[in-house]
Amino acid sequence: MQLRHRTGTRRDLPQIAEIYNATIPSRMVTADTEPVSVESRIPWLEEHTPERRPLWVVEDAGRIVAWLSFSSFYGRPAYRKTAELSVYVHEGFRKRGLGSYLLRQAIGHAPAIKVDTLLGFIFGHNEPSLALFGRLGFSRWGELPKVAELDGIERDLVIVGRRV
């Protein structure tokens, strides 16, 4: 598979939501406990602009197989040069380098959108994601112990970061 990405659009939302929703049962990736609707993702999509907070998708044979979003951190002007990254890969396409590809592209693109600090918020038990971000130069910047409860189990949230 030749890796390329493009800007995500409204017509991509069903597949973006499908990939996201498929991660919910694992209780490793998101704090959402129920599937999200396509309609509920429209305001989220509208927060993403190619110039400041891109949303990218990777396609294979016309089907979205991974996506990455840059999101504003904490919504205050002083944090405008900081962005949170979220990466989601279709279950059938994991372990093929898509997450690494998207993160590398995000790191390289950050200066063009005036971002110099990238963050990830990852559950402490999500070892694959922690390892992925670690391989790409992200360090553990903080931990919020037992801030999430998933199926009666308290989970830590790890904050990873990297300057670019």
Feature annotation, model-predicted:
Residues R4-I16:
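A short beta-loop-alpha structural element at the N-terminal edge
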Residues L85, L118-G120, V160:
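A structural signal for short, well-ordered beta-strand segments
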Residues A110-I122:
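Conserved GNAT acetyl-CoA-binding A-motif
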Residues S72, P77, L119-I122, G134, ...:
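Conserved catalytic-core motifs of GNAT/GCN5-like acyltransferases
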Residues P35-G92, L103-R104, H109, R163-V164:
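Acetyl-CoA-dependent GNAT
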Residues G8, V89, I122:
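Hydrophobic adenine-recognition pocket in adenosine-nucleotide-binding enzymes
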Residues K95-G108, E127-R135:
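Conserved acetyl-CoA-binding loop-helix of GNAT-fold acetyltransferases
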Residues A17-L45:
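Conserved GNAT-fold acetyl-CoA-binding loop/helix
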